[in-house]
């Protein structure tokens, strides 16, 4: 069981923060049942993920795409059209007009016989 350090992986993924995201993604994949590309050697999933990155048995680009896909709140549909920009700008214009309109008086005036 060899020790894996960040320095072993930095030449493959230069940004340490990206390395953490990619290793965490790969560790989640392994926990979910993905096949490991190296022997486990009694290591836990995050260590296995770092070892895979260090030994270049997994592509960081593939992990990066998986990270982006998992972080997306709205997945694009295949039948989406590009004319939605027009409707968005129309909605923004309608909101601007509504916001600039004078407010109605909602106070209860002398007409109220309470």
UniProtKB/Swiss-Prot annotation:
Which EC main class describes this enzyme?
transferase
The EC number of this protein is 2.7.7.6
Q: What's a BP term from Gene Ontology annotated to this protein?
A: DNA-templated transcription
**SMART domains from the xrefs?**
RNA_pol_Rpb6
Q: Sorted alphabetically, which SUPFAM superfamilies does this protein's record hold?
A: RPB6/omega subunit-like
The keyword Isomerase is annotated on this UniProt entry:
no
MF terms (GO), sorted A to Z:
DNA binding; DNA-directed RNA polymerase activity
The entry's keywords: DNA-directed RNA polymerase, Nucleotidyltransferase, Transcription, Transferase
Question: Where does it sit, as one GO cellular component term?
Answer: DNA-directed RNA polymerase complex
Q: How does it assemble?
A: The RNAP catalytic core consists of 2 alpha, 1 beta, 1 beta' and 1 omega subunit. When a sigma factor is associated with the core the holoenzyme is formed, which can initiate transcription.
Give the record's family classification. Answer: Belongs to the RNA polymerase subunit omega family.
Q: What is this protein called?
A: DNA-directed RNA polymerase subunit omega
């Amino acid at each position: 069981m060899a020790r894996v350090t960040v320095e072993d992986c930095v030449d493959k993924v230069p940004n340490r923060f990206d390395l953490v995201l990619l290793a965490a993604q790969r560790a989640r994949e392994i926990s979910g049942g993905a096949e490991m590309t190296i022997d486990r050697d009694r290591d836990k999933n995050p260590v296995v993920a770092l070892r895979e990155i260090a030994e270049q048995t997994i592509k960081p680009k593939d992990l990066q795409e998986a990270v982006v896909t998992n972080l997306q709140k709205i997945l694009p549909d295949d039948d989406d059209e590009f004319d939605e920009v027009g409707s968005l700008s129309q909605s923004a214009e309608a909101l601007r007009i509504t916001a600039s309109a004078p407010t109605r008086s909602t106070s209860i005036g002398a007409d109220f016989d309470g």
